[in-house]
Design a protein with these regions (language model features):
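N-terminal secretory signal peptides
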Residues: 1-4
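N-terminal export signals
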Residues: 7-27
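Active-site acidic carboxylates
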Residues: 16, 30-143, 171, 175, ...
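Short, well-ordered alpha-helical scaffold segments within catalytic/effector domains
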Residues: 64, 162-166, 189
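Short catalytic/ligand-binding loop motif for oxyanion handling, primarily in non-cytosolic enzymes
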Residues: 85-89, 148-149, 187-188
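Histidine/lysine/aspartate-rich catalytic loop segments that bind and position anionic ligands
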Residues: 134-163, 167-168
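Glycine-rich anion-binding loop/nest that anchors nucleotide
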Residues: 174-190, 204-210
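Histidine-anchored nucleotide/phosphate-binding helix
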Residues: 189-197
Length: 240
């Protein structure tokens, strides 16, 4: 370990911070107890992204018990759902000759094309079985505009249309978000980075997420998040 990294980790522990520039929590630092200014964001833990779903994330079901344990530590919990229309612009089936995981150009830029998934009102779009969040206060549904995708819980892919989550959190004095759910390299990462752009402290709880990892997208997502100041932690870094 370099002298610079040792000093960064030492400073983070001494200041009671979880990490700096994407480094994990120092082993000597005590777990942090979230206060009333913190919120747990549970992103898209839905049947469509779980084993047997239409767009399954490998081991996606394994985040559920971790998130359930974390929930006990938070006064503020927000849940998101992908909520697509039939024939959504992000579906490969909408574009003649296109296959899932190819790309196309839409009005707001390059769009990854997905299998049809999380269609409004279907069981595929339901929250995953076993997810227990009885104190969750808000559900954000995203991706329901037919011509625009929405990975982030804050802002749709056009980078203009807001979901209202920013105002909801700030009106309640919340300044820190802990992001969990599916998938690390898409909806989780975009949510965490938008949180930073909007002035929140943002943590991604790594073992409470799983990735799709298309052609190195997971590694890129972690680098992009670190560059934005998103902090990467484990569930054990949070006191129950």
């Amino acid at each position: 370990m370099s002298a610079q990294r040792r000093q960064l980790l030492k400073s983070a522990a001494g200041a009671g911070m979880l990490c700096l520039a994407g480094f994990p929590l120092s082993a000597s630092a005590a777990p942090v107890k979230p206060d009333r200014k913190a919120a747990l964001l549970v992103v898209d833990v839905q049947n469509c992204f779980l084993p047997g779903g239409t767009l399954p994330v490998k081991e996606g079901n394994e985040v559920i018990p971790v998130i359930n344990r974390l929930a006990a530590a938070f006064d503020n919990i927000v849940v998101t759902q992908d909520w697509h229309t039939p024939g959504h612009a992000s579906f490969a089936s909408t574009h003649a000759g296109k296959k899932p995981f190819e790309t196309t150009e839409l009005g707001y830029g390059t769009q990854v094309l997905w299998p049809d998934h999380c269609v409004q009102g279907t069981s595929d779009a339901d929250l995953g079985p076993g997810l227990k969040l009885p104190t969750a206060q808000l559900m954000i549904r995203k991706g329901y505009h037919k011509d625009t995708d929405s990975y982030s819980a804050f802002i749709e892919a056009d980078k203009k249309t807001r979901t209202g989550l920013d105002g909801y959190l700030k009106s309640r004095g919340i300044d820190t978000v802990y992001v969990t759910g599916l998938a690390t390299d898409f909806c989780v990462a975009w949510t965490a980075m938008d949180a930073r752009d909007l002035g929140f402290d943002a943590y991604v709880v790594e073992d409470a997420t799983r990735a799709i990892d298309l052609a190195g997208s997971l590694d890129k997502a972690w680098k992009d998040m670190a560059a934005k100041g998103v902090k990467r932690i484990r569930s054990t870094d949070i006191a129950a």
